[in-house]
């Protein structure tokens, strides 16, 4: 079960990291460095990434629960 958790977290991290980069590029968030500075920009990206990881983990947990409720796993 522990191995499964690490795999789940790795997938969530990778998906959130990639999505954060795409969001930053699409919205032009790099421009916020002029106002926020490099540390503030890093914090902004960090907050976006952790928000996405939380959402991914919630969806994953819901999927697993649905599979268990239907005796599929």
UniProtKB/Swiss-Prot annotation:
Full protein name: Uncharacterized protein AF_2355
Record key words, sorted: Signal
Source species of the chain: Archaeoglobus fulgidus (strain ATCC 49558 / DSM 4304 / JCM 9628 / NBRC 100126 / VC-16)
Keyword set includes Signal: yes
Signal peptide residues on this chain, from the entry's feature table: 1-30
């Amino acid at each position: 079960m522990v191995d499964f958790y690490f795999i789940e977290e790795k997938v969530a991290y990778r998906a959130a990291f990639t999505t954060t980069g795409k969001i930053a590029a699409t919205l032009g968030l790099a421009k916020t460095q002029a106002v926020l500075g490099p540390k503030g920009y890093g914090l902004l990206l960090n907050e976006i990434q952790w928000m996405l990881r939380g959402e991914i983990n919630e969806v994953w947990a819901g999927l697993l629960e649905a599979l268990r409720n239907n005796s599929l796993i």
